[in-house]
């Protein structure tokens, strides 16, 4: 009887994975870089509670010519890594519609949902490690930090409502809410640009190209091209 229940459970799980393979694949790919971040964390329960969790420090080369290397805390390195992956996944999400326009292949809602969950997870961890490294009050001392927090809060709303129940409950309002994903992209670029913590220009270029592809002129041009090819 137990073996029968176990086999039935495995069958249900396998069928779910087959049905939602796009969601599962996106989540796995998205969370793989977290392994590197988790490796920075050291657990030691032999001493007092204050030392149970610690993170190694790293020596980072200067970003500009002539700039001396500097020592970065493990939490600081985690802030950098999670922040970079957060903005990468934000750009990936915003690139899905342009990809659909160019190829005629529309990513499923579940792939978009998984990408959104991944982006929000990295953004949440980015803020968490920042609080560990600098303290949460530091968030309100610079405009770049405030803009980043605003982007993370909007992403939280999008992540919470990224399901079929919310779509049915909110109806037309759901699409309006999820258009704020574009604002998240803009805020994320501003966040990085104002703080000068990374190379934000490639992300800006990709986003601008994506917005141009979404334009009515470009959509009509693509549609006309496909019609001519089919005739």
Question: What are these model-predicted stretches?
Answer:
Residues 2-231:
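Membrane-embedded alpha-helical bundles that constitute the cytochrome b-like, heme-associated redox core
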